[in-house]
Amino acid sequence: MAGKAEKKSNTRSRIISYVMNNENTSKVEISKNLNISMPTVLSNVNELMESGVLVETGEYASTGGRKAKSIGINPSYRYAMGIVITANHVGMTLVNMRSEIEKTDRVRMKFSPETSYCGELSILVKKFLEDMEEPEKLLGIGISIPGIISQEQHLVVKSHALKIENYSLSFLEQSFSCPVYFENDANAAMMAEDIHQYKNAIYLSLNNTLGGAFCIDGKLFSGQNQKAGEFGHMILVPGGRKCYCGKKGCADAYCAASTLTDGKYESLELFMEALSEGNTKAQKKWADYLDNLAILISNLRMAYDMDIILGGEVGGYLADHMLALGEKVMLSLIHISEPTRRVVI
């Protein structure tokens, strides 16, 4: 009996996952693409519709006979919350079952390793969710942290941004009444980009420190020690600038957002304003930044042959500069005859 129940649960999970990734599908398409018999699909879909997980979303054009009903995920069936912890801020986002943002907020709150921080965060989250009509519909909370996280030991092994080592996540977890999942910030951002869409891709997190992540066959790859994707500590300029890790010439020292502000600007926004106003020093710094970023992208492209997604603070400003960056990248890849992979933001 247990085996039969487990098989049914697995079938339902596959159907739900398929519908979530294929909006407005049909029972016929589910049966065909998941290789599940039509009677099994009908039984499971009907039960999922009765429980409110799936809903009818319309009808397909008729080719004769009855019109097939299209089905999709019920967006309000459940919700999930994401929390982004940084050194000086907390970002919060509530999404529905279609990954559509219902609410978002960002609050200035300095991180502290003390237990009082956990209490303050709990109060902040409760306030954020106070207008949620059915709080029991919250599936769980995902918390992203800038640092190396050990899922087995349930701790932050090290975070330069938060200035912590071997920090237990138990107190944070106990601050909430729902399931809590912790993930490295770059890994979380990679998953948010829809790894099923990209299948094989690299994510570069261009924040005050340079992070990275990548997925293979639609699955996040963490490596043997959860350190995969530490692209910020690949040597970009041998013997170059000193990195906070102690080495010289790391990509972080050339491609992190902090290299643009560098004590002269209070924020990246102010730097970009100076750039748009034609400030010559800002223009020179930006040109150098793009040169270094192009080299890093080229190296990653040569090593992994994947799409590269540019995110983080700098990623938000790159839309108007992709042509210049693309030209710099192509100079490094000019000898490659096959079509190059995409660089996206």
Q: Which residues does each PLM region occupy?
A:
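Extreme N-terminal segment that seeds HTH/winged-HTH DNA-binding domains in transcriptional regulators
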Residues: 1-33
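Short glycine-rich, Thr/Ser-proximal phosphate-binding strand/loop in the N-terminal lobe
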Residues: 2, 84-116, 155-156
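Conserved phosphate-binding catalytic cores of ATP/NTP-utilizing and phosphoryl-transfer enzymes
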Residues: 56-80, 180-203
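Gly/Thr-rich phosphate-binding beta-strand-loop-beta motif of the actin/hexokinase/Hsp70
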Residues: 67-102, 203-205, 210-215
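Glycine-rich phosphate-binding loop and adjoining helix at the ATP-binding site
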Residues: 104-200, 319-331
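Glycine/GP-enriched mid-protein hinge/lid loop-to-helix segment characteristic of carbohydrate kinases
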Residues: 104-106, 170, 176-280
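Adenine-nucleotide phosphate-binding core of ATP-dependent small-molecule kinases
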Residues: 116-135, 251-254, 261-321
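Single conserved hydrophobic/aromatic residue that forms the stacking wall/gate
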Residues: 334-345
